[in-house]
Amino acid sequence: RKINVGLIYRQQFFEVEESEPIRLVFKDQLAEKSYTRDILYVKGKLVGEIVHLFIVHLPSKIDKEINQLKRQQIFKVIRKRVNDLLTENFSEKIIIMGDFNDTPTNSDLIEELNTRAKQEEVIGKELFNPMVGLQSYKRGSLIFKKQWMLFDQQLFSKSFLQHQSNLEYVK
Protein backbone atom coordinates (compact mmCIF):
# COMPACT_ATOMS: atom_id res chain seq x y z
CA ARG A 1 0.00 0.00 0.00
CA LYS A 2 3.03 2.22 0.22
CA ILE A 3 1.82 3.73 3.50
CA ASN A 4 4.33 3.89 6.33
CA VAL A 5 3.99 4.62 10.02
CA GLY A 6 5.95 7.41 11.63
CA LEU A 7 6.59 9.19 14.89
CA ILE A 8 6.14 12.92 15.27
CA TYR A 9 7.71 14.35 18.42
CA ARG A 10 9.00 17.52 20.02
CA GLN A 11 12.77 17.57 20.26
CA GLN A 12 12.71 19.48 23.54
CA PHE A 13 10.91 16.51 25.19
CA PHE A 14 12.05 13.45 23.23
CA GLU A 15 15.49 12.41 21.99
CA VAL A 16 15.73 9.42 19.63
CA GLU A 17 18.53 7.02 20.56
CA GLU A 18 17.76 4.33 18.00
CA SER A 19 15.03 3.37 15.58
CA GLU A 20 14.36 0.56 13.17
CA PRO A 21 11.55 -0.59 10.95
CA ILE A 22 10.48 -4.15 11.73
CA ARG A 23 9.48 -5.68 8.41
CA LEU A 24 7.35 -8.77 8.18
CA VAL A 25 7.16 -10.78 4.98
CA PHE A 26 4.34 -13.24 4.47
CA LYS A 27 3.83 -15.88 1.79
CA ASP A 28 0.46 -16.87 0.37
CA GLN A 29 -0.61 -20.33 -0.84
CA LEU A 30 1.32 -19.81 -4.09
CA ALA A 31 4.47 -18.79 -2.20
CA GLU A 32 4.00 -15.21 -3.37
CA LYS A 33 5.45 -12.64 -1.00
CA SER A 34 3.09 -10.26 0.67
CA TYR A 35 3.88 -7.35 2.97
CA THR A 36 2.18 -5.22 5.57
CA ARG A 37 3.20 -1.86 6.93
CA ASP A 38 6.39 -2.03 8.96
CA ILE A 39 6.25 -1.78 12.73
CA LEU A 40 8.35 1.21 13.77
CA TYR A 41 10.47 0.59 16.86
CA VAL A 42 11.96 3.66 18.52
CA LYS A 43 14.07 3.82 21.66
CA GLY A 44 14.58 7.24 23.11
CA LYS A 45 14.61 9.53 26.10
CA LEU A 46 11.29 11.12 27.03
CA VAL A 47 11.95 13.93 29.51
CA GLY A 48 15.18 12.16 30.41
CA GLU A 49 13.84 8.60 30.83
CA ILE A 50 14.35 5.73 28.40
CA VAL A 51 11.18 4.56 26.65
CA HIS A 52 10.60 1.93 23.98
CA LEU A 53 7.91 2.68 21.42
CA PHE A 54 6.31 0.35 18.91
CA ILE A 55 4.20 2.24 16.37
CA VAL A 56 1.75 0.15 14.34
CA HIS A 57 -0.88 0.39 11.64
CA LEU A 58 -2.20 -3.14 11.40
CA PRO A 59 -3.88 -4.74 8.38
CA SER A 60 -7.59 -4.06 8.05
CA LYS A 61 -10.39 -6.52 8.75
CA ILE A 62 -11.06 -6.72 5.00
CA ASP A 63 -9.89 -10.13 3.72
CA LYS A 64 -10.52 -11.30 7.26
CA GLU A 65 -8.87 -14.75 7.14
CA ILE A 66 -5.68 -13.59 5.44
CA ASN A 67 -5.30 -10.43 7.47
CA GLN A 68 -6.19 -12.10 10.76
CA LEU A 69 -3.23 -14.45 10.33
CA LYS A 70 -0.99 -11.48 9.52
CA ARG A 71 -2.26 -9.58 12.54
CA GLN A 72 -1.64 -12.57 14.81
CA GLN A 73 1.91 -12.87 13.50
CA ILE A 74 2.52 -9.14 14.00
CA PHE A 75 1.28 -9.45 17.60
CA LYS A 76 3.65 -12.39 18.17
CA VAL A 77 6.64 -10.44 16.83
CA ILE A 78 5.83 -7.44 19.04
CA ARG A 79 5.21 -9.66 22.07
CA LYS A 80 8.57 -11.36 21.63
CA ARG A 81 10.34 -8.00 21.44
CA VAL A 82 8.47 -6.78 24.54
CA ASN A 83 9.31 -9.99 26.43
CA ASP A 84 12.98 -9.67 25.45
CA LEU A 85 13.09 -6.07 26.71
CA LEU A 86 11.35 -6.96 29.99
CA THR A 87 13.54 -10.03 30.52
CA GLU A 88 16.63 -7.84 30.17
CA ASN A 89 15.19 -5.12 32.44
CA PHE A 90 11.81 -5.69 34.12
CA SER A 91 11.26 -1.96 34.64
CA GLU A 92 11.50 -0.94 30.97
CA LYS A 93 8.93 1.61 29.90
CA ILE A 94 7.19 0.31 26.78
CA ILE A 95 4.34 1.79 24.76
CA ILE A 96 2.69 0.11 21.79
CA MET A 97 0.52 2.58 19.92
CA GLY A 98 -1.24 3.19 16.67
CA ASP A 99 -4.13 2.02 14.54
CA PHE A 100 -4.88 -1.57 15.53
CA ASN A 101 -7.77 -1.77 13.03
CA ASP A 102 -9.78 -3.51 15.74
CA THR A 103 -11.34 -2.84 19.11
CA PRO A 104 -9.56 -3.06 22.48
CA THR A 105 -11.60 -6.18 23.29
CA ASN A 106 -10.39 -8.15 20.25
CA SER A 107 -9.41 -11.64 21.44
CA ASP A 108 -6.21 -11.79 19.37
CA LEU A 109 -5.05 -8.47 20.83
CA ILE A 110 -5.80 -9.65 24.37
CA GLU A 111 -4.28 -13.13 23.98
CA GLU A 112 -1.27 -12.49 21.75
CA LEU A 113 -0.15 -9.21 23.35
CA ASN A 114 -1.29 -10.26 26.84
CA THR A 115 -3.28 -7.08 27.50
CA ARG A 116 -5.34 -6.23 30.56
CA ALA A 117 -8.22 -3.79 30.98
CA LYS A 118 -7.50 -2.97 34.63
CA GLN A 119 -4.27 -1.57 36.04
CA GLU A 120 -4.34 -3.91 39.04
CA GLU A 121 -4.31 -6.92 36.66
CA VAL A 122 -0.90 -5.90 35.29
CA ILE A 123 1.43 -7.73 37.66
CA GLY A 124 4.21 -8.92 35.37
CA LYS A 125 4.79 -8.73 31.64
CA GLU A 126 1.17 -7.94 30.82
CA LEU A 127 0.33 -4.69 29.05
CA PHE A 128 -2.31 -2.25 30.25
CA ASN A 129 -4.89 -1.17 27.66
CA PRO A 130 -6.71 1.91 28.99
CA MET A 131 -8.73 2.10 25.79
CA VAL A 132 -11.01 -0.73 26.96
CA GLY A 133 -12.60 1.66 29.44
CA LEU A 134 -13.02 4.37 26.82
CA GLN A 135 -14.82 2.35 24.20
CA SER A 136 -18.57 2.99 24.03
CA TYR A 137 -21.37 3.42 21.54
CA LYS A 138 -21.08 7.21 21.98
CA ARG A 139 -17.37 7.69 21.26
CA GLY A 140 -14.38 6.24 19.48
CA SER A 141 -11.63 7.09 17.03
CA LEU A 142 -13.64 6.50 13.85
CA ILE A 143 -17.18 5.94 12.62
CA PHE A 144 -17.94 2.97 10.36
CA LYS A 145 -21.48 2.38 9.10
CA LYS A 146 -22.78 4.97 11.59
CA GLN A 147 -21.18 3.14 14.52
CA TRP A 148 -18.31 4.36 16.68
CA MET A 149 -15.17 2.18 16.69
CA LEU A 150 -12.05 2.58 18.81
CA PHE A 151 -9.14 1.39 16.67
CA ASP A 152 -6.46 3.87 17.79
CA GLN A 153 -4.95 2.54 20.99
CA GLN A 154 -2.01 2.79 23.38
CA LEU A 155 -0.74 -0.10 25.48
CA PHE A 156 1.56 0.45 28.47
CA SER A 157 4.03 -1.75 30.34
CA LYS A 158 3.76 -2.13 34.11
CA SER A 159 6.45 0.45 34.85
CA PHE A 160 4.12 3.25 33.69
CA LEU A 161 1.65 2.21 36.41
CA GLN A 162 4.13 2.58 39.25
CA HIS A 163 5.00 5.86 40.91
CA GLN A 164 8.77 5.46 40.72
CA SER A 165 9.67 7.91 37.97
CA ASN A 166 8.73 11.10 36.15
CA LEU A 167 6.70 9.08 33.64
CA GLU A 168 3.50 7.35 34.64
CA TYR A 169 0.07 6.62 33.27
CA VAL A 170 -2.49 9.05 34.71
CA LYS A 171 -6.18 8.49 34.08
Describe the role of every protein-language-model region.
Residues 49-68:
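Active-site His/acidic residue clusters
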Residues 58, 99-100:
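Active-site metal-binding loops of divalent metal-dependent hydrolases
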Residues 1-50:
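Structured beta-strand-rich core segments of catalytic domains in phosphoester-bond hydrolases
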Residues 68-90:
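A long, amphipathic alpha-helix that forms part
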Residues 49-51, 90-93:
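Loop/turn elements at helix/coil->beta-strand transitions in domains of secreted/extracellular proteins
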Residues 34, 65-73, 145-146:
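Soluble non-cytosolic domains of exported or imported proteins
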Residues 86-92, 102-171:
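Metal-dependent phosphoester-hydrolase catalytic domains
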